[in-house]
A protein has these predicted regions:
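Hydrophobic/aromatic-rich transmembrane helices and adjacent perimembrane loops
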Residues: 50, 284-285, 291, 302-336
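Transmembrane-helix signature of polytopic, membrane-embedded enzymes
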Residues: 12-16, 93-116, 135-136
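Transmembrane-helix motifs of polytopic, lipid-linked glycan transferases
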Residues: 76, 80-101, 140-141
């Protein structure tokens, strides 16, 4: 008995080391870039506005990104925040797993998630965004919900309400986990609907989310315009291809975890067969929470077509490890089996880390190696030659303008998508008095965006974009020339 206890303690130490290694490795990979990913840049910009909404999402992720970046103006702090959320999510997955699995299997249900690209490659490439926040809050919601319906502690109901409220304040997709929880409760815990703490929890969540509801009303439900713009009006075939592509990408995202689990099964002659003595309510808890969000996304694909993003489903794989070990259990997980799967996870980590690091180092892409100082210096000189006002506003393609807003000395304000109604924080009169610089890679778009950003321009206003070229160099000194355009709309009375 003491030997078994010692083995579990040893495995726990290895598990903690694994979490620390994951935190360190994936917090540093992004430093190969010269600028943060666009999602993180958007977050910093939105967070700096201190508002209760954005043109795309509720505000929480933006606030967090801005707070992480603000003290030291450091990209590393944003990458570190991302991995702190992921490791936090791992901890709550482990805590939830212990209700379904033994101690060793619970740790392994987290460890094999290293093979799920949502926890490594994707966060390393896209940085901190609302999806990363979900990687923490969804396991937290699931854990506290399970606690609430089984143990009915007031503290857990209070925490559940707070977490759900902030989860909705981060992304509306939180509903895709809340919805199956209601279904499960209806069939297996009807008495919960008579519990006063259930309603207190709902009220707490609503109160936390309510400032955003007020913001939505004040701003004519701006994020839903973004969603409407994502709907695909192209050929009908896309509406069938998109769900199929979604499924293929979901398999690709989870293939690393599936391989770690499957190879261990084969190596140790553990058959792929369902376990015995399942509790019906636990089976449906995992199936509903684990699969309903993905099914809903498939249905969404039928409506959205080609504009559906496969990565919208990545954050819902947090139950993958638990489901694998629960439905296809090992008869007994020995120390050798534990170490084999742990080593496999490290091998996957190294492979993915080197692959992503190489990609980010080799690519000559403005998304990862944007020469902010050079472009800002050149545009500032061009602005000074034409205008006697400060270079205060910049519009155009956000992947060109946001790096300048975040990193440049004077932080010119980005006009998102160059639509005034999508930028409620901008004072049109002040913009008119100071002028705007429009920046884009496509000449024809400059004309369209100029009129969108400045609705006060007369219809016959002549717009003649100026060509501009710059060199972008990767980590190995190889360069690429980008040809873009800009146009300065001078101050007007």
């Amino acid at each position: 008995m003491s030997t078994q206890v010692d083995e579990v303690k040893s495995e726990k130490r290895l598990f903690v080391i694994f979490l620390l290694v994951h935190l360190i490795v994936w917090s540093t990979i992004g430093l190969v870039r010269t600028v943060l990913p666009t999602d993180s840049l958007e977050g910093i910009f939105w967070g700096s506005l201190h508002d209760f909404g954005t043109p795309k999402h509720p505000p929480l992720a933006g606030w967090l990104t801005y707070l992480a970046f603000l003290p030291f103006k450091s990209d590393f702090c944003v990458y570190l925040l991302s991995q702190l959320f992921i490791v936090g999510g791992f901890i709550f997955i482990y805590k939830l797993a212990k209700y379904f699995l033994n101690e060793t299997a619970s740790m392994l249900s987290v460890i094999i998630l290293e093979g799920c690209w949502a926890y490594s490659y994707v966060t390393g490439y896209y940085g901190f965004n609302p999806d990363v926040v979900l990687l923490l809050v969804l396991p937290m919601i699931s854990y506290y919900f399970y606690n609430c319906v089984h143990f009915n502690k007031p503290k857990d109901w209070l925490l559940l309400g707070i977490i759900v409220g902030f989860a909705f304040l981060n992304k509306y997709q939180t509903a895709l986990v809340i919805f199956p929880m209601f279904i499960w409760t209806f069939f297996f815990r009807k008495e919960v609907f008579k519990n006063k703490f259930f309603y207190i929890s709902m009220i707490i969540a609503f109160l936390i989310f309510s400032p955003h509801i007020y913001w939505l009303v004040e701003h004519e439900f701006l994020p839903f315009m973004y969603f409407e713009g994502e709907l695909d009006s192209t050929g009908w075939l896309n509406h069938f291809v998109a769900p199929m592509l979604f499924l293929v990408v979901q398999f690709a995202v989870t293939v690393g975890s599936l391989l770690i689990f499957s190879i261990a099964k084969l190596k140790f002659n553990s058959p792929f067969k369902l376990g015995e003595d399942y509790k019906k309510e636990d089976v449906w808890f995992l199936l509903l929470l684990g699969l309903t969000p993905l099914i809903v996304h498939l249905v969404m694909g039928l409506f959205m077509g080609g504009t559906m993003r496969p990565r919208w489903g990545f954050e819902f794989w947090f139950l993958l490890g638990i489901m694998l070990f629960y439905f296809f259990p090992f008869k007994e997980i020995t120390k050798n089996q534990f170490c084999f799967m742990l080593k496999s996870a490290y091998v996957v980590m190294i492979i993915v880390f080197l692959s992503l690091g190489t990609l980010l180092s080799v690519e000559k892409n403005y998304r990862s190696r944007y020469p902010v100082e050079t472009i800002y210096s050149d545009l500032s000189k061009a602005w000074a030659e034409e205008c006697d006002t400060p270079f205060k506003y910049i519009g155009g393609y956000i992947e060109w303008t946001l790096p300048i807003t975040i990193y440049a000395k004077t932080h010119p304000i980005t006009i998102l998508d160059t639509f005034g109604f999508k930028n409620p924080w901008i004072n049109q009169e002040d913009q008119k008095k100071n002028g705007v610089l429009i920046l884009d890679r496509i000449k024809e778009k400059i004309v369209k965006q100029s009129f969108q950003a400045c609705p006060y321009l007369p219809e016959n206003y002549k717009i003649d974009p100026v060509p501009y070229s710059f060199e972008l160099t990767n980590a190995f000194g190889q360069s690429r020339t980008y040809d873009i355009y800009y146009f300065i709309i001078p101050p007007m009375k």
